[in-house]
């Protein structure tokens, strides 16, 4: 608990430092790819600081009519529960992984990136989720990738931008209730926009459920001295789901 409190204080300090963030434009050496190794905390750049560091607004979400009614009903149910101070059940309550692309931004939890020439490993502190990006390997046909929480990711460098192609996400793994089929493809473009500021542009494509691709961008700031905290959800997990699908907490008996 004390370690988590220190993390929260550190995240608050980082958030406040954004106000004074700015300086000259960032330039990257053309001789080699940028080094993304480090621990990165999500934040909303540009608040009182340099607006050029703020991620662009997401594109409009265009869900096909056959899936729209169910999507809107689920989002409305989520909003209604929140207005009552409640939460509807999701996989995380049972300690299931968030999966892709949700794992790239879980509240204020950081993501650690370990970069080598052939593989880039990303570790989300929440739930200790791990994904591996295989660099300069060909992507498999979607039907040849067993469905999983994180899918299969391959990457390549386009100048200073890491382009990642991910397929094979389980249909039950959704980002903000957006429906998808096994044909979904996720494309990421990760790029340093300043020495310690990283943008991850994420595009979700599924010609079955979406009329057009949906794109949003996450922003992170590097935390040079942070040590990742062990996260074991199953240990002392006291959350459960009642008959109405509402998340409840078991109160420990004295």
Question: Where are the regions a protein language model picked out?
Answer:
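PEST-like low-complexity, intrinsically disordered acidic/proline/serine-rich tracts
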Residues: 2-3, 12, 23-254
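Low-complexity, intrinsically disordered segments with a bias for serine/threonine
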Residues: 19-21
């Amino acid at each position: 608990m004390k370690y988590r409190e220190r993390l929260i204080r550190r995240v608050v300090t980082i958030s406040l430092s954004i106000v004074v963030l700015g300086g000259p434009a960032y330039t990257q050496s053309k001789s080699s790819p940028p080094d993304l190794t480090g621990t990165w905390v999500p934040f909303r750049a540009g608040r009182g600081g340099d607006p050029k560091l703020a991620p662009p607004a997401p594109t409009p979400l265009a869900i096909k009519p056959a899936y729209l009614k169910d999507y809107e009903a689920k989002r409305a149910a989520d909003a209604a529960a929140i207005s009552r101070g409640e939460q509807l059940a999701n996989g995380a309550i049972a300690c299931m992984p968030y999966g892709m692309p949700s794992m790239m931004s879980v509240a204020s939890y950081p993501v650690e990136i370990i970069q080598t020439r052939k593989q880039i490993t990303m570790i989300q502190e929440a739930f200790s989720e791990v994904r591996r990006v295989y660099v300069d390997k060909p992507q498999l046909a979607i039907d040849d990738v067993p469905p999983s929480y994180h899918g299969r990711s391959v990457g390549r460098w386009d100048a200073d931008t890491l382009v990642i192609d991910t397929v094979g996400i389980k249909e039950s793994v959704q980002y903000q209730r957006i429906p998808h089929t096994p044909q979904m493809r996720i494309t990421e473009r990760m790029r340093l926009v300043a020495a310690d500021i990283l943008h991850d542009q994420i595009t979700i494509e599924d010609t079955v459920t979406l009329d057009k691709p949906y794109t949003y961008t996450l922003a992170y700031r590097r935390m040079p001295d942070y040590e990742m905290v062990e996260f074991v959800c199953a240990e002392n997990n006291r959350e459960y789901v009642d008959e109405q699908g509402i998340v409840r907490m078991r109160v420990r008996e004295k």
